[in-house]
Amino acid sequence: MTEERKLYVCMRCGRIFSKSEMEILPGIRCPYCNFKIIMKVRSPMVKRIPAI
């Protein structure tokens, strides 16, 4: 079973980190600058859905 690695980016310092790195601190914060606003990095794969 492959585990999908979820990546996040800090909106202040711009560093990319994983969920396991984020769990070092209590709450949801950047492990490098302690900023609270983070964004989940989107997958580069495009999902196409057929039109009806």
Curated annotation (Swiss-Prot):
Its EC number is 2.7.7.6. One of its GO terms (biological process) is DNA-templated transcription. Binds 1 zinc ion. Keywords: Cytoplasm, DNA-directed RNA polymerase, Metal-binding, Nucleotidyltransferase, Transcription, Transferase, Zinc. It comes from the Archaea. Its cofactor is Zn(2+). It catalyses: RNA(n) + a ribonucleoside 5'-triphosphate = RNA(n+1) + diphosphate. The keyword Transmembrane helix does not apply. Its main location: cytoplasm. SUPFAM superfamilies: RNA polymerase subunits. It is found in: Cytoplasm. Zn(2+) binds at C13, C30, C33. GO terms for molecular function: DNA binding; DNA-directed RNA polymerase activity; zinc ion binding. Transmembrane segments: none annotated. It is an enzyme of class 2 (transferase). GO terms for cellular component: cytoplasm; DNA-directed RNA polymerase complex. Belongs to the archaeal Rpo12/eukaryotic RPC10 RNA polymerase subunit family. Part of the RNA polymerase complex. DNA-dependent RNA polymerase (RNAP) catalyzes the transcription of DNA into RNA using the four ribonucleoside triphosphates as substrates. This is DNA-directed RNA polymerase subunit Rpo12.
